[in-house]
Amino acid sequence: MEENTKEMIVIDNVDRYNKIFGLETRHPLVSIIDLAKSTTWPTRAWFRYEVYALYLKNVKCGDIKYGRQYYDYQDGTIVCFAPGQITDLEMLPNIQPNAHGILFHPDLIRGTALGQEIKKYSFFSYETNEALHISEEERQTVMDCLQKITIELEHSIDKHSRRLICANIGLLLDYCMRFYERQFDTRNGVDKDIIVRFEHLLNEYFEGDAPQNQGLP
């Protein structure tokens, strides 16, 4: 199938997503995802998200393209999407998808504290081809947060349900924000170290006889 003939799948609610992957819908506005339990899935498609989505990839089972570049995700990475974003999905043949995550509709958080703060989670609008690489300890933290939300979804809906679900989603996103900041703070430090070493090598070069013998580096 040619790229321009790929189907455009609009994920405008969580039930639509669950039907595409053969998963159960427990709540109309939020769903905890376990793609290892999926019974069907598209192999090549464009996804247009009208919900928030966060995935913890357990294995690389395909490629995800956002804009013109591919995410650099591997095992144990997190990728996030916000309403209005379009991704290009290409699944590896004969490989079961394997990822955990959460989808939630903007209506779930509308009028809540999380709804007022959602834009601070900049990883939802991250426009490069980088995913969040997490440690095993961080992965367990994410899984614990997802489990808390799962337990709440299994509970009979009452007047506390929405507040508790939103609070636990907020907790999950706060942890992810910490992980993102750790990753990029670390990377910035590495970049600075490279620049310092490069400047040191240049100084050594120009302080010796190399410029006269070999010319400019």
Show which residues each predicted segment covers.
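Generic protein-terminus/edge-of-domain signal
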Residues: 1-65, 69-71
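A cytosolic small-molecule/anion-sensing beta-strand core signal
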Residues: 58, 74, 83
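Short beta-strand His + acidic residue motifs that chelate non-heme Fe in jelly-roll/DSBH
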Residues: 63-65, 87-94
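Short acidic-glycine-tyrosine-enriched beta hairpin
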Residues: 68-80
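Histidine-centered metal-chelating micro-motifs
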Residues: 79, 84-90, 109-110
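A hydrophobic/aromatic-rich effector-binding and dimerization subdomain
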Residues: 92-157
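Compact structured core domains
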Residues: 136-185, 189
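DNA-binding recognition helix and immediately preceding turn/loop
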Residues: 194-217
